[in-house]
Amino acid sequence: MSTYDEIEIEDMTFEPENQMFTYPCPCGDRFQIYLDDMFEGEKVAVCPSCSLMIDVVFDKEDLAEYYEEAGIHPPEPIAAAA
């Protein structure tokens, strides 16, 4: 599977009300990926309007702050890397 680009999680916009990260797509829409999907290992954000996809660069430990911002708990405890 080929992706359009590789984007750091810090460069994406987090929408706490949807628990979703977005990033502008060249088609005018936005790439989307859900926080829980990322927690489960998904690293590809998809644009709902075209066929483009991007790789999202993050560490699982990075997600804790976004769960806190959304006011929810992660599906399981996030352990710091040893």
Curated annotation (Swiss-Prot):
Superkingdom per UniProt: Eukaryota
Keywords: Cytoplasm, Iron, Metal-binding, Nucleus, Oxidoreductase, tRNA processing
Function: Required for the first step of diphthamide biosynthesis, a post-translational modification of histidine which occurs in elongation factor 2. DPH1 and DPH2 transfer a 3-amino-3-carboxypropyl (ACP) group from S-adenosyl-L-methionine (SAM) to a histidine residue, the reaction is assisted by a reduction system comprising KTI11/DPH3 and a NADH-dependent reductase, predominantly CBR1. Acts as an electron donor to reduce the Fe-S cluster in DPH1-DPH2 keeping the [4Fe-4S] clusters in the active and reduced state.
Effect of residue 56 to G: Resistance to zymocin. Sensitive to thermal stress, diphtheria toxin, and caffeine
GO biological process: protein histidyl modification to diphthamide; tRNA wobble base 5-methoxycarbonylmethyl-2-thiouridinylation; tRNA wobble uridine modification
Alphabetical list of SUPFAM superfamilies matching this protein: CSL zinc finger (SSF144217)
Pfam families: Zn_ribbon_CSL
Protein name, as recorded: Diphthamide biosynthesis protein 3
Subcellular compartments: Cytoplasm; Nucleus
Pathway involvement of the protein, from the record: Protein modification; peptidyl-diphthamide biosynthesis
Family: Belongs to the DPH3 family.
